[in-house]
Amino acid sequence: MEVIYEDNHIIIVNKQSGEIVQGDKTGDRPLSDFVKDYLKEKYHKPGAVFLGVTHRLDRPVAGLVIFARTSKALARLNKMFAEGQVHKTYWAITQLPPQSPAGQGGNTGQGGTVTHWLTRNEQQNKSYAHDHEVPGAKKAMLHYTVIGHSNR
């Protein structure tokens, strides 16, 4: 576990792809448990350690997660997220450049929009993206800008 920032109110951790932030039906040990263990050991805390989950990242996503170390910090961060005061930025590394319907969108500075319809299968604990409208699905739009290329 990599701690990026820590003070008396929050702790920011670099979540790896494949980890879950909070417990779910899979029974896999969540990142929040590892952070609690870290805090308990570092500060020699007896008993339970408070740790508030302020937001989540999906299992396949790597990135920074902010946890609250106090209930007051959790309330403030929840309010900030609810009021849109927190701006999230996602960077994706793809094998091939994205293609817009006109065949553009792969050059640096260019971009586009990808639209999918999302469905969830609770029994499989999986979500699916469809490239066409599906009854009961939630429409999801992703606006992107290409920021670089690699020779790889």
Could you say what each language-model-derived stretch is?
Residues 1-152:
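RNA pseudouridine synthases
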